[in-house]
Amino acid sequence: MIEYRSVQEHLHSPDLGNYCAYGIYAYQVEPSSSKNILAIHDVFLNAADAISFVHRCNQLELSPVSLYDVIQ
């Protein structure tokens, strides 16, 4: 089973300085473990938007292959 999670990231940009963003991570979840299989960084600036997005991805059982397209 695939599970999506939002992850808070502390980043730095020469133009913006330090800032906080949220990435989207896909995990392959097994009964005894979970493994990160895909990470897309710096997707959202708002935590609520990131949480809502991963909730929809999990609810719709989105394939990791489609994650880049859905984010765009």
Feature map (PLM): residue ranges:
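Short, mixed-charge low-complexity intrinsically disordered segments
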Residues: 60-72
